[in-house]
A protein has these predicted regions:
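Active-site neighborhood of HAD-like aspartate-dependent phosphohydrolases
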Residues: 40, 52-110, 126
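Generic beta-sheet signal
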Residues: 62-64, 131, 185
C-alpha cells in the first residue's frame, strides 16, 4: 500500500513538472508573428559607413551623388504643407509649378538633415571626393536648395543641385543623365528609382532607409534589387 501511495505521488509530481501544451482553440484572423520569427533577418546586404570608409582607403578621390528628399533631408513637412495648400488629399500638387517654386525657394530651411547623410558626406569630403546632389524635384524659379544643403552639410566645394524633374529624357530613369554627366561612382538614394537609375548608369547604387513617417508612401523594399543598404540610415 505504501509503495502504491509513493508511486501515485511521483506520478502527480512528474505531471505537474511537465508544462501544459497550449491548444489553439480559434483560428488566427491576422498574419501576426512570434518571437522566433522576429529574430529572423531578411537576406539583405547591409553595409555601414565605417565599412565603406575602409573599402575606399587608399583609392583615388571619386565623385558621389545623393538624392535629396528622404536621403539627406527629412523634408516631409514641406511636402505635407504643399499637399494641404495645393491639392488636399491628392498628389496633384506635385504637378503644380507654384508648389515647386515655393518649396525650392526656401522651404528646406525647415527640413531636418539626416545623421546618416552627415556621416557619409563627412567621410567622403575627408577623402577629397566631390559631392553632387541629384533630385527628382522639378526646378523652381529660384534655387534656395543649394545654399541650404551647403550650410547643412558644410560642403567645401558646392555644386548646384541638379533638378531632374520635368526634363526631357533619353533614359528610362530621370536621375540617370545627372549620374552620367558628373561621372559618379556611387549614388545614394532611398527610392527604387535611385537604385534603378544607378543600375542604368552602370554605377554602384546604395540604398538609404526612408523614415517610417515620411509622406512618401508606400515604403520601398530594402534590397529589392540586390543593392547594398546602409544600416541605421532612416534618420
Amino acid at each position: 500500500m505504501k509503495n502504491l501511495v509513493k508511486l501515485s505521488l511521483v506520478a502527480l509530481l512528474t505531471a505537474a513538472a511537465i508544462p501544459a501544451m497550449a491548444t489553439k482553440t480559434e483560428p488566427y484572423t491576422n498574419q501576426g508573428t512570434n518571437a522566433r520569427e522576429m529574430l529572423v533577418e531578411q537576406p539583405i546586404h547591409w553595409i555601414s559607413v565605417e565599412q565603406l570608409k575602409k573599402e575606399l582607403e587608399g583609392k583615388a578621390p571619386i565623385n558621389v551623388s545623393f538624392d535629396i528628399d528622404d536621403t539627406v533631408l527629412f523634408s516631409s513637412p514641406c511636402f505635407y504643407h504643399g499637399q494641404q495648400k495645393y491639392s488636399p488629399g491628392k498628389h496633384d500638387y506635385l504637378k503644380n509649378q507654384d508648389f515647386w517654386n515655393e518649396v525650392n525657394a526656401g522651404c528646406d530651411q525647415y527640413s531636418i538633415p539626416k545623421q546618416i547623410a552627415i556621416d557619409l558626406i563627412n567621410m567622403h569630403q575627408a577623402r577629397g571626393d566631390q559631392i553632387y546632389f541629384i533630385t527628382g524635384r522639378t526646378a523652381g524659379d529660384k534655387d534656395g536648395v543649394t545654399p541650404v544643403l551647403q550650410k547643412a552639410f558644410n560642403i567645401k566645394d558646392m555644386h548646384p543641385v541638379e533638378f531632374m524633374g520635368g526634363r526631357e529624357l533619353s533614359t528610362k530613369y530621370n536621375k540617370t543623365p545627372g549620374i552620367i554627366k558628373h561621372k559618379v561612382t556611387i549614388h545614394y538614394g532611398d527610392s527604387d528609382d535611385d537604385i534603378l537609375a544607378a543600375k542604368e548608369a552602370g554605377v554602384r547604387g546604395i540604398r538609404l532607409m526612408r523614415a517610417a513617417n515620411s509622406t512618401y508612401q508606400p515604403m520601398p523594399t530594402l534590397g529589392g534589387y540586390g543593392e547594398e543598404v546602409l544600416i541605421n540610415s532612416s534618420y
